Amino acid sequence: MNADFLGLLLLYLAILLCAAPLLGRHIRQAMNGERTWLTAWGQPLERGLYRLAGVDPAAEMDWRRYAVAMLVFNVLGVLAVYALQRLQGWLPLNPAGLPGVAPDSALNTAISFVTNTNWQGYAGESTMSYLTQMLALTVQNFVSAATGIAVLIALVRGLARHSAATLGNFWADLVRATLYVLLPLSFILALALVSQGVVQNLDPYVEAQTVQAQQYETARLDAQGQPMTGPAGQPLTDTVVTRVQNLPMGPVASQEAIKLLGTNGGGFFNANSAHPYENPNAWSNLLEMLAILLIPAALCWTFGEMVGSRRQGVAILAAMTVLFAGFSASAAYFEQQPTPALRQAEAALLADGGNLEGKEARFGVAATALFATVTTAASCGAVNGMHDSFSALGGVTPLLQMQLGEVIYGGVGSGLYGMLAFAILAVFIAGLMIGRTPEYLGKKIEALDMQMVALVILATPALVLAGTAVAVLADAGRAGVLNPGAHGFSEILYAMSSAANNNGSAFAGLSANTPFYNVLLGLAMWFGRYTIIVAILALAGSLAAKPRLPASVGGMPTTGPLFVALLVGAVLLVGALTYVPALALGPVAEHLQP
């Protein structure tokens, strides 16, 4: 780890941790229905939306009604996004004349964006019309993030309330998170990105003549538009030579802003934030990294204020920051190591360079390694370089951060409710060690609570490992692997980890836009999202019904360094050890290969 990366990391954390309390306080006020600086324009619109939908925001829901409302809303979202993709060839705002998306790809994409995963098996500039990008994908970027915030706030209410039967109103939480948090921040960030050169228009694509002929390989497609494979299962490609380049246009900045702030991650273009029209320079890169973790960090402060003790939120934030700093340093160190070719040339370890494969020259190793850590610490999935080109151990950092459950800051809302599940596990373990009934924030942790916590922690590993096994055993699964051996296994493991944990980034060597992977990854995304959410809401309902107990002398404090250390240990030991055998077969084996 060199001085460039250390300076960038310290600057990043300083800005992030200074902004978190300010935004966290605003989120608490907005979600509680208190007056904020946005009330003057937001409240009339909020009331109008309630009247239009026939919703009484004061009518509270128990956890079951809250869960049903959330699930119905998200199922309707899948149907709407699917329909828009299938019909886009007949709809307006399609200057490139793009046809409707294939059924399996459309279903995968619909589930992906509704679940806040934003896994993309397609290239946006050659698949999605402007209308689909705006009305289907961008809208889901907002409401999927708002759903995560709403579920978190319901859990926090469960911890803050006592002897209560309700958790709030899902529709009110959804509207407030969108109107008062996501929309204003996205508007500000979109303007900032436009000022740096990010594209924002509805113009048709521009055809440019290149000075030199370009030659590249493209996947050979069948009559249904699916990639073809040879007798041995290898992908078939065609060589294309051209002197014409299409420069894609579109409403990029408006989608880019919420893609980052909502920890969605789906790029307008295939190259995502490595594309100069999405992320032109170092300033836009810093803004995008800050946007990814801004709301997850701020929600820790919101949590502390809502439960009546800011130190509770600070302790959770401290644990997240310790884990994040460690993983960031690891990624930077391994990516700064010279590749085998550079090592043979006796390149210095601390010299500029390192593993530059798959990295944009305008960002370099340090900014790419930090971006990779940021985007997989959150359930974002946006990338400014190719994770598949990371070194074997450098690629472990983004992979393992996802496998921990996306709790190191994590997604908007989802990261903190996942970390709170680990916090309850930590106090449960501590209670067992000292022979006392475990308590968290004055609530006794009982059998039902631990069953829900266990479901939250173990659901995604089960999906990841089972899905990886199915893909490795199936002919259709192995056919999508471009690189054989340990790295090919890592590509499958990464795809399943990304889908089940709702991240969306990929080791791009896997040809995943096939019926097999579209269905398999779609199932992983759906159950990885909603199994955990329903378990969290059941946990919230159980905690809300409990009386609050006074602090006892022998109780474990949950605001000090000891608790932070115990929480970090619980995340690493319980989360990471689950995947040790799989990691040994993939990136570790690849690293040990001569």
UniProtKB/Swiss-Prot annotation:
The keyword Repeat does not apply. Keywords: Cell inner membrane, Cell membrane, Ion transport, Membrane, Potassium, Potassium transport, Transmembrane, Transmembrane helix, Transport. GO terms for cellular component: plasma membrane. One of its GO terms (molecular function) is potassium ion binding. It is found in: Cell inner membrane. The keyword Mitochondrion does not apply. It is a multi-pass membrane protein. InterPro entries: KdpA. It comes from the Bacteria. The chain crosses the membrane at residues 3-23, 67-87, 136-156, 179-199, 287-307, 314-334, 415-435, 453-473, 519-539, 562-582. Part of the high-affinity ATP-driven potassium transport (or Kdp) system, which catalyzes the hydrolysis of ATP coupled with the electrogenic transport of potassium into the cytoplasm. This subunit binds the periplasmic potassium ions and delivers the ions to the membrane domain of KdpB through an intramembrane tunnel. Belongs to the KdpA family. The system is composed of three essential subunits: KdpA, KdpB and KdpC. PANTHER family: POTASSIUM-TRANSPORTING ATPASE A CHAIN, POTASSIUM-TRANSPORTING ATPASE POTASSIUM-BINDING SUBUNIT. This is Potassium-transporting ATPase potassium-binding subunit. It comes from Bordetella bronchiseptica (strain ATCC BAA-588 / NCTC 13252 / RB50). The gene is kdpA.
